Curated annotation (Swiss-Prot):
Group of enzyme by EC: transferase
Cofactor(s) listed in the protein's UniProt record: Mg(2+)
Lineage summary: Bacteria, Pseudomonadati, Pseudomonadota, Acidithiobacillia, Acidithiobacillales
Coarse class of the protein's main subcellular location: cytoplasm
HAMAP family: PanB (MF_00156)
Chain's gene name: panB
GO biological process, one term: pantothenate biosynthetic process
Keyword vocabulary terms for this entry: Cytoplasm, Magnesium, Metal-binding, Pantothenate biosynthesis, Transferase
Statement: the UniProt record of this protein carries the keyword Hydrolase: no
Name of the molecule in the record: 3-methyl-2-oxobutanoate hydroxymethyltransferase
Organism: Acidithiobacillus ferrooxidans (strain ATCC 23270 / DSM 14882 / CIP 104768 / NCIMB 8455)
Residues annotated as binding Mg(2+): D44, D83, E114
EC number of the protein: 2.1.2.11
Length: 261
């Protein structure tokens, strides 16, 4: 097992929490690494956060590889996760493995895919062939057009049992990590307790082994943030004020300063 991953597994056993951010480029990856963040996810959410799209479905494998390379160059010792985008892995294990290799060649340590027990054979195939897989259940954004909206999952007894079964099947298949998104806190806590691999929560309460937030959300760079996100600063306002000051100084001939020679 990769020594970085082994450290995460040991931290789960010891009750030590890990902090992950979703980032898409070198400058933000470098800031995260310098701040002591433990993991960086190169998410297909780049299609929404930096691409302005309404969902993640238009993101390509080539785009994911490009952004993964940028993040890796700034990530330092952070564990780097990268998303397999919609359409790059659902046909079967062979397609998923080939797509995952592309992201590994871009520098990713772990490749993430969405889906429950139906993806267990794909997880096993990739794991047996040298790919570290992070599974993702609960709210899986790549299915938004099937559901019609981004909605919480596991809120009734039947769906909660199904998600618990999914978690067990994916862990048994060899997944190294499991993302739990937008599920009830108690369900996330139960799954975290029941499986040996580290869980990473987003909108899933405080009891997962790690938490992940989009770096733009926690820095206050977007106009809106998900209800589970915390804006640690109003970075967008600070940046707008700086840009407005630049515009003012240029307009008043204060910048650049006049040189004597």
């Amino acid at each position: 097992m990769h020594k970085k991953i082994a450290r995460w597994v040991q931290d789960k056993k010891s009750g030590i929490k890990r902090a992950v951010v979703t980032a898409y480029d070198y400058p933000f990856a470098r800031l995260a690494a310098e701040a002591g963040v433990h993991g960086i996810l190169v998410g297909d959410s780049l299609g929404m956060v930096v691409g302005g799209g309404s969902d993640t479905l238009g993101v390509t494998l080539e785009q994911m590889a490009y952004h993964t390379g940028m993040v890796v160059r700034g990530a330092g010792d952070c564990l780097v996760f990268a998303d397999l985008p919609f359409g790059s892995y659902e046909k079967g294990p062979e397609q998923a493995w080939a797509a995952a290799v592309t992201l590994l060649r871009a520098g990713a340590d772990v490749v993430k895919l969405e889906g429950g027990a139906e993806m267990a054979s794909t997880v096993a195939f990739c794991t047996e062939r040298g790919i570290n897989i992070c599974a993702h259940i609960g709210l899986t954004p790549q299915r938004v057009r099937q559901w019609g909206s981004f909605q919480r999952q596991g809120t009734d007894a039947d769906s909660a049992r199904r998600l618990q079964a999914d978690a067990g099947a994916l862990a048994e298949a060899g997944a190294r990590f499991l993302v739990l998104e937008a599920v009830p806190d108690a369900l996330a806590a139960n799954i975290t307790r029941d499986i040996a691999i580290p869980t990473i929560g987003i909108g899933a309460g405080p009891d997962t082994d790690a938490q992940v937030l989009v770096i733009h959300d926690l820095l206050g760079l977007g106009t809106e943030s998900p209800p589970f996100a915390r804006r640690y600063i109003e970075g967008g306002r600070i940046m707008r004020d700086a840009l407005a000051e630049y515009v003012r100084e240029v307009g008043n001939s204060e910048f650049p300063p006049r040189r004597k020679r």
